[in-house]
A protein has these predicted regions:
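Second-shell loop/turn segments in exported
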Residues: 29-30, 65-76, 98-106, 132-133, ...
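Active-site beta-strand/loop signature of hydrolases that rely on acidic residues for catalysis
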Residues: 41-46, 76-79, 83, 90-113, ...
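Structured beta-strand-rich core segments of catalytic domains in phosphoester-bond hydrolases
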Residues: 107-194, 200
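Short, solvent-exposed loop/turn elements at domain surfaces
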Residues: 48-55, 204-205, 306-308
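Bacterial Sec-dependent N-terminal signal peptides
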Residues: 1-30
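N-terminal, active-site-proximal structural segment of metallo-dependent hydrolase catalytic domains
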Residues: 24-123, 129-143, 330-334, 361-364
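Extracytoplasmic, non-cytosolic globular domains
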Residues: 132, 178-184, 189-277
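Metal-dependent phosphoester-hydrolase catalytic domains
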Residues: 27-33, 172, 227-237, 245-364
């Protein structure tokens, strides 16, 4: 197996180090405990956020007005409205302003994210801005990144293309891995973090036969992190995405070496914030009557400090955002994610995955 990486780079030259404005210092209930600031970082698979226009060279025909999904402007507008509401609610359990950063998957293009942000900002008072780099996926779906323009200041964006070659001659050319570096703000003192957004190869053809693609994706993530460590040995890194594997699967446990318990994590190692929730039977998507937790958030050792300090973010807790409005309330699918479509039938729901999130805290 070989890995081929193509790197796409965009750089913002911005005033990241400016003090927070008075609006940011508004008195809001953003504390984990008295004297602590909290920030939410989330991931959400948006389940086929396609517009109604054909993208040249992409197999998006199913999501056109005359395609299999009969994807009309009305359906698209309802999808955007639903997802904007869901996105606007992420993190509000601990900060009414919502999440600082949100990685997303299954988005057709940057235009869809602009529509999503515009809806969330105008209707729900959010301050979201989007980032997306076009990748080579055949259907045209990409990963992206939304950020609150006050709570997070992006400084650099890299996209890494994955090509996995197999012994039988097969090849996967799929979604970019998107690395967004920037400054997570809090009381005027920013701290740099790196967020890597993923959507790993699917299990099409079976979990075992498709495993090499996800193992290769895990190796690519590890190489991205290693390159960050070369310049920043104490860098703080958040790995997130729809990995199409559970925390105990080979790609996560053995290739990336993301651990179940924080005390097992070595210097520059990784902690899987979702593993123990799956052990308790809590998942992010349901399949054939059982739960999986493919929507994972993995953090590195520098984020695991148990000492709270001013100006330094550290991990507090993880959450699966399985709120009632995102959940089927009756019938045989009761208790599972409320989807946009099922078996080709329009349901006007949200998506087949629950969002996942972590909270970082620091001393005020």
């Amino acid at each position: 197996m070989k890995i081929s990486i193509m790197k796409h780079t965009m750089i913002w030259v911005a005033a990241m180090m400016l003090a927070m404005t008075s609006a940011v210092n508004a008195q809001v209930n953003e504390k984990a405990n008295e004297g602590q600031f909290v920030r939410c970082i989330a991931f959400y698979n948006l389940e086929n956020l396609f517009d109604t226009i054909h993208d040249e060279g992409k197999n998006d025909y199913e999501y056109l007005p005359d395609g299999g999904m009969k994807w009309t402007s009305l359906k698209y507008e309802n999808k955007v409205k639903n997802m904007a509401y869901a996105v606007s609610q992420l993190g509000t359990d601990y900060d009414p302003r919502g999440a600082a950063c949100i990685g997303v998957a299954e988005v057709e293009n940057i235009g869809c994210l602009y529509d999503l942000c515009a809806e969330a900002n105008s209707k729900y008072g959010r301050r979201l801005k989007p980032i997306l780099l076009e990748g080579p996926d055949r259907r045209g779906v990409d990963v992206g990144f939304l950020y609150d323009s006050i709570m997070f200041k992006p400084s650099k964006v890299n996209g890494f293309e994955l090509k996995a070659h197999y012994a039988d001659g097969g090849e996967i050319k799929t979604r970019l891995q998107l690395c967004v570096s920037g400054y997570l703000m809090g009381d005027g003192r920013p701290e740099k973090i790196h967020v890597i957004v993923n959507h790993w190869p699917s299990r099409y053809g079976g979990e075992l036969s498709s495993r090499p693609g996800r193992d290769t994706a895990a190796m690519l993530v590890k190489s991205i992190c290693d390159s960050i460590y070369l310049k920043e040995p104490k860098a703080k890194i958040v790995i997130m995405g729809d990995l199409n594997d559970d925390p105990y699967n080979h790609s996560c446990k053995d290739v990336l070496k993301a651990r179940k318990h924080r005390e097992e994590v070595e210097p520059q190692g990784y902690f899987n914030t979702m593993w123990q929730m799956l052990d308790r039977g809590i998942g992010s998507l349901a399949y054939n009557g059982s739960w999986n937790l493919f929507d994972q958030i993995i953090i590195n050792e520098p984020l695991l400090s148990e000492k709270l300090e001013s100006g330094k973010w550290t991990y507090w807790k993880a959450q699966i955002f399985n709120k009632p409005f995102l959940t089927v309330q009756e019938g045989k699918d009761k208790g599972t994610p409320f989807r946009t479509t099922k078996a080709g039938v329009w349901q006007n729901g949200y998506g087949d995955h629950y969002p996942t999130m972590i909270y970082l805290i620091r001393k005020k």
